[in-house]
């Protein structure tokens, strides 16, 4: 519909132009032949004939403007009745021209530009550069047409002059509107830059501190010279992170390393007016400070160096792991076994498994217990006792040693004497502690965890010994003790908690060399009960 309306408008304009040209040619022919025009002798009649012709052209132009506005606005309105009657009369007179124009649409499209330029030179109201003119321009054109219609007879030049004055403004407005799509893409790019600049602007205008601008300028120039320019401002809690205040707060506390070691991030968070409910606020602030401010701190203040920073970070990580590991190390308790109490740790300077009467001799060791004040107490094996464990055996050994140390500590504290005064324990006490440890801890754990423990120890009498513990099931433990090259083997069975003494059934096999010789002996049959570690082989 729009294209059809435009084509009809152009056709009407072309007809009006052809009529004007025909009239001009006719006047030229009359003047060249020397004949007087009909209007020469009768000026009044000539003016009367000219006025209807001018009004006719003006009406045609008004109808063209109305049709163009309807086409641009997407409306299918009909022109005025006078224009439609004139259009019908002209269409009947020029049917042949319409047929030719319909047949040659391509030629008409080519002549469109030239015809419009000619019409603009004659009648400035016909400014039809495009179909998509807005309502404001159409309103201005309508006002111009109405004023031209109200002028009356013999006054065609004033509206033409007024339209010439209005045309440059309309053309400039059209150029501005035409320039809007062209300048749209640069505006989008500027919008992205504006957001980036707006972040910097917010950072500079967070408060009225006069030192803020000086600090930020110095910081950005330093990072630029360093080769790591600040390309973006960090955002935290949906707001720009105040780098200036963060630097001031951290340096007041002694620098980044001091803040990490003393765990002062909560105070830093409050100083920045950030919500304390932020997840990992300390980690976020630390990483942002390391990225944007720590090189500047090292350069300007020299409060620490990167090596100290790395050491502080590693120490913080180790401390966190130690806290989580220490609370769960000695809390294992299988179902059906008595649960062990978690208590302060002990530092043991010497610990050995002994106290059993083997071959008429007693293996005893000195055990020193030291209680440290106001400090966590850790359990440590002496360096002269190498321990070889596999899989979960280390955990079992630590549990056994922990149970023994706890029992010793309870007895010493109940007696009311300081731990430093009792330096040694008797062989019977050690035997009872070892038996209880094996039955209540190792046996309970090895019911689910296979283990093979070998403890080599060298006593003061230069006697080499080794202990091997192997689980045979849920109710027994195979035990092998090596002393001075002699191997003692046996089986330890589970005993109810009510009995005071343990029961051991098994056999011992001695293989060794004494004074360059070797001897093998077989102990009592397995069915003969005996006390633990009391199978004495015959020489």
From Swiss-Prot:
User: Which SMART domains does the protein's record reference?
Assistant: ARID, BRIGHT
Chain intervals with Acidic residues compositional bias: 84-100, 113-141
**Mind listing the GO molecular function terms for this protein?**
DNA binding
Q: Where is this region: Important for cytoplasmic localization?
A: 495-502
The segments labelled Important for nuclear localization in the record are: 405-448
From the UniProt entry, list the residue stretches annotated as the region Homodimerization: 450-471
Residues in ARID domain copies: 209-301
Give the UniProt record's GO annotations in the biological process aspect.
regulation of transcription by RNA polymerase II
Q: Where is the composition biased (Polar residues)?
A: 161-173, 497-512
Q: Which residues form the REKLES domain?
A: 404-499
Q: How does it associate, per the subunit comment?
A: Homodimer.
Give the protein name, as stated in the record. Answer: AT-rich interactive domain-containing protein 3A
- What is the species of this protein? Xenopus laevis
User: What gene name does this entry carry?
Assistant: arid3a
